[in-house]
Structures are given as structure tokens and as C-alpha cells.
Amino acid sequence: RILDAGSILNYSFLLDHHKLQNKNLFISTLAPEQDAFWNKGISYIYEDLRNTCFRNDYFDWITSLSTVEHIGLDNTMLYTSDEAKRESDGEGYLAAIKEFHRILKPGGKLFLSVPFGEHKVRGWFQIFNGEMVDSIKTTFSPTEIKENYFQYQGSGWVNSSRELASNATYFDIHTEKDYGNDYAAA
């Protein structure tokens, strides 16, 4: 079983990939989206990732890409009209990490991505710094963790290190008019 926590896989060209064929895929997102692929056997759950409906040790894999940086913050800008989701809890993501740990089978894999660099709350998302990544690791322990860091440069995304990426900044494509020098948007 695979949980797509945040609906990053909800595109036909991804769902048709041979690696996802014959998999029991659940897509969990805050609110219904324009496209749904029930005909492909996808199960959709509309819920807050801080309090899921799944039993303990249910998933073999969880993917949560470009999602947890929005948890606990103002999700009314892009994702829902539910005023209850106009929040400002900068640590709300930790409840989702606890939930991922609870519903992931022992030995299961979590694929998680967050924007990393200089911490900044943008209202509807936040940039994670080293302390916040460490809090994720502590919350998800005990388990084996492998970290990878990437940085955007003029030529595109490149492998980096925690130290080198710690000063990265991001352009907010939805609220700012001028791109940063590196064109890295979040």
C-alpha cells in the first residue's frame, strides 16, 4: 500500500507509470481537486494529515512531497475555502510527521521533501531550516533516516549539502512580482 500524502501523484501520466501499476494507492489531500482517477483504482481521502483515518502500521510507502510546509498554515489561499484552515501554527507539520510514523509499517519508507534554507513563514507555506529538519527526524525516530539536499542554480537543481543550502531563499510565485537572482520559486 502506498499513501500519497498531499496529492503529488494525482496526474494521469504519473499514475500510468509502470512502477505504480498494480499498487494499492491512496491519495490523501485536504480538499477535492479538479481531477480524480477512480477508474484507475485510486482511493481518495479528503482529510487533514495531522489526523488521518488509517489504522496503525497500514502503509508500506508514504510519499509527501511539497506538502508538510503548508500544514498548520493558511491553506485558504490555494487549497480550500474552509476558513477553519486559515491557520498560523508553524509547528503543525510535526503532528503530520507523528501521524506518518504511526501509519507507516515497521521497515516502511517515507519520502518527504520540504523547501530548505533560511526559515521564513510566507503565510501559506514556510521554508524549513536545520532545526526544523532535526525536529522531523526526532519526531520520526527511532528509524533509519537518509537526507539529501538540493539547491537551485541557474542551470537547474543540483545536489548540495545541508551547510551549503542553509542560506537558500525562495521566491513566492503567488505573492511576489520579482524573481530572485536564482529563479528558485516555491
PLM features: residue spans?
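A short acidic, Gly/Pro-enriched loop at the edge of an enzyme's catalytic core
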Residues: 50-62
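A short glycine-rich, Lys/Arg-flanked "PGG" loop and its adjoining helix->strand segment in the class I
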Residues: 80-109
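Residues lining the SAM
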Residues: 65-68, 84, 113
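Conserved catalytic-core motifs of eukaryotic protein kinase domains, centered on the activation segment
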Residues: 73-78
